Amino acid sequence: MDYTNCKLYRIKSKKSLKYIIKIRDKKYYKQSLIAKEYNVFIDENFKPRLVEAPSYELKQIQRSIKLQLNQIKVPDYVFSGVKGKSYYDNALIHKGNKYVYKIDLTAFFPCIPRDYVYLFFINELNTSPDIANILTNLTTVDLTLCSIKNVQKVETFYMQKKLRNSNHLATGSPTSPILSYLVNIPMFDELYDLSSKNNIVMTIYADDVTFSSSNKISYQIKTMVNKIVTKYQYKISKPKVKSYTKNYPKLITGVVLDRNGNPVPRNSMRLKVKKEITELKLHPEKSKKRLQGLLTAIRQVNPGQYQNLYKFAKE
């Protein structure tokens, strides 16, 4: 892996770091102070999910770090956190393959400990220890230092997911999707090598790993996938494991590929559009923004749909 295009490579001074990632306040050097910049809660709208949302200023610094990390050339199988690639592109790679096997890594970001991130900055980007420490502080969060409104819900989530790392890759940071790959290159490369040797296409989109082939993906391959993931101390979410055969539509990172491999909008997305249309009268501004987001996602799959409604939502 070539890291030389990344301006964070071999950074040794705070002055240089401050200039590159636009740090305006020294409080962003210390994790104890950075922790106060997070709003931590459990989102229960769809399924329980740990949210660690950074403040506006912290998020701007994280975006600057992401900008530099995006200069690192990653393999074609990586789709999350990569400029110019999306969940839609990730799904299209598997178009035409009859068999699909999907896995989801359980609570992936919270399972990536601070140490992994620190070792990436110091060993791979060759920064000095103090710079590696600052960059790690900016991209991870220590929940023991955060002001959490509902601690009990967070503790319950941790118990249910059997999580151990209170200090981990921050779920709401713009840097997390690409860092989740960069700190786990050995695992993902091992999965990719297994796939390549068996004529299987593999892609990763954050915690979603998708395998597809024109031939049936054997039980032995699936067992090997599980062994590799377990070897690196991660877990596969059993309820989210999906196998699709040639006669069924395939759902990949939110995109449905029909029996012929063509992308089609999900029925749930259409239902959400109908719901937002009825909500327009009650909450016009909020509903209009949500409607625009939904229609943008649908039109990415089918550009011809909802043309007039899309124009209205953009006004």
Set out the residue ranges of the language-model regions.
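Right-hand nucleic-acid polymerase module
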Residues: 1-133, 137-173, 181-193, 217-315
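Catalytic palm active-site di-aspartate
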Residues: 102-106, 172, 176, 197-214
